[in-house]
């Protein structure tokens, strides 16, 4: 009898998860519910900065269940994304080697902020994957600066693109950041709207890592779709 009850509980859990995933897929049919920004970016000026997280000297980021670090994984995503955006007629450039003092996060961010302005980036995305000491932590989320309305809209569309391509991955939503929070220096400091992409937990084997391992190009297509839809439907004149 005990085994039967355990099997029933597991079956109920699987059914609940399936219903949750179906609801997430249904939400994709709707446009993200975000306020319309007060300013827009002309299409001809759209220049996407694709920043590979942990590109500062002496840093490669967290390591996934498969032994691949953040920088190595996202370097591939960045190169694919640049090509995918080009197919959409959207200009972009990759930043995968931050300047600054060795080992200094602040110095690297100061260099990156100046570099993005010099390259006339109109939006900036920094690519990461999440990590946790709790191997069960999973799902995708996008971070934006709490006072940036365009940053919020960009985060929503990137999340929407990822949900379209990876519908079975938990949606943790968009998350605002304020001073002192993780990622705040990048999100606040850039002259343009910015977003930090955390599409999965590299420290979660199932479902996150098994879904995203060797799928760098699928992930880049998800990001490109989000950027394209954002530019078509929400911001660009």
Regions found by a protein language model. Give the residues of each.
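Generic L/I/V-rich hydrophobic alpha-helical segments across diverse proteins
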Residues: 8, 15, 22-25, 29
